Regions:
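Proline/glycine-enriched tight loop/beta-turn segments at coil->beta junctions
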Residues: 3-9
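Serine-dependent carboxylesterase/thioesterase catalytic core
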Residues: 10-14, 21, 31-42, 48-145
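Glycine-rich His-Gly loop
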Residues: 13-16, 154
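Post-His helix in hydrolase/transferase enzymes
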Residues: 54, 185-198
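C-terminal alpha-helix
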Residues: 61, 65, 193-201
Length: 201
């Protein structure tokens, strides 16, 4: 007998230069699944706002929506995956999260951010390889052990470079057969994989 699809609320966190509209295709695929979906808008001023501050904002928005204890699933795309992970590890989100899906997120940093000055674009600088934020998150990820963690990445990603390092230090990881960063949230092959991960319980 197949298990029923989960009805836990799902939170979708967008990335740099994106808005919640990014998830429209995914949300259409989820219609009829009887689960609440929340896609908050996190203005980041072109990457100037530190990711910890955005994670704090995310915490407040989730609590406004479902209080402090409702169990959720979380999916973050690109920078949104690092924001989501920061919320999980530093703002207590792991205590209430069943599943975390990181999609094309620079969890180990990205070379494309290396030359960006932190004084001007603090949020972008948080995604440098070896940034203080990523060193902290990767140095102690014990809080993620209670969460089902899944990473999806594009090998040829030019936004998160190298693409194969856009993975969490724990859980499963899958290379998606697409050619670009944005196709991770738009290509049917990628959407199929995401839907499968979201619906299996």
């Amino acid at each position: 007998m197949q298990s029923e699809a989960p009805t836990r609320p799902l939170v979708l966190v967008h990335g740099l230069l994106d808005t919640p509209r990014l998830f429209s295709r995914l949300e259409r695929r989820l219609e009829g699944q009887h689960r609440p979906v929340f896609s908050p808008h996190l203005p980041h001023r072109f990457g100037a706002i530190p990711l910890r501050k955005l994670a704090q904002q995310l915490d407040g928005l989730i609590q406004e929506c479902w209080g402090a204890e409702t169990t959720i699933d979380l999916l973050g795309f690109s920078m949104g995956g690092v924001i989501g992970r920061t919320w999980l590890q530093e703002f207590g989100g792991a205590k209430r999260t069943q599943r975390f899906i990181s999609v094309g997120s620079p969890q180990q940093g990205t070379l494309t951010a290396q030359c960006i000055p932190a004084w001007l674009f603090a949020g972008l600088a948080d995604m440098k390889r070896g940034s203080p934020l990523l060193r902290s998150l990767n140095g102690d990820y014990a809080k993620l052990q209670s969460v089902e963690c899944i990473s999806f990445f594009c090998r040829w990603d030019l936004m998160v470079c190298p693409g194969w390092q856009a993975v969490l230090p724990i859980g499963t990881s899958t290379a998606v057969p697409v050619l670009t960063h944005q196709q991770l949230m738009s290509h049917p092959k990628s959407l199929d994989l995401l839907i499968e991960s979201l619906l299996i319980d």
